[in-house]
Amino acid sequence: QTGLDKKNLLRKTEPIEIVSDKMEAFQEKKMIIFSGNTVATQGDIKLKTDQLTIYYKDANQKKEKIGKQEIQTTGDLERIEAKGNVNVTQKEISATSEEAVYYQEDAKIIMTGNSVLKQGKNIIKGCKVIIYLDENRGDVQKCDAEKSGRVTAIIHPQDKKIKD
């Protein structure tokens, strides 16, 4: 178990605030790219990355105004891709990687490339971290056969103070 709170993580109905240096909208491709010091916040979850790409589903298109530009969106996310220096935090839990993809329909996040999951002092490292939001669990996997490396965990037992 990762300790991630599935009720708070990537809520479908709560808005996501995204701040970046640049935004490009591609209506025909149904995607929006945010780049440069990108920070996405939803509730108590914060994602920082170099570039964030949002992909929308085809059906039920509607127009939304973002700044002065009107873009066509569906409101339903297909997936969100984060590339470069990915850092996801929620309360005392953080996960870092080179890339991450959130699949809304499957309610999972796949983080790849030097993935590290931290909770308090505990640290788990691997090539891939998969977070299953509906199941409130996560898997950390080793690298492929052609790459070296295994899953590494550093667990700190909790200090229990004894009262005299």
Question: Which residues does each predicted region cover?
Answer:
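Mature-chain termini and adjacent capping regions
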Residues: Q1-D164
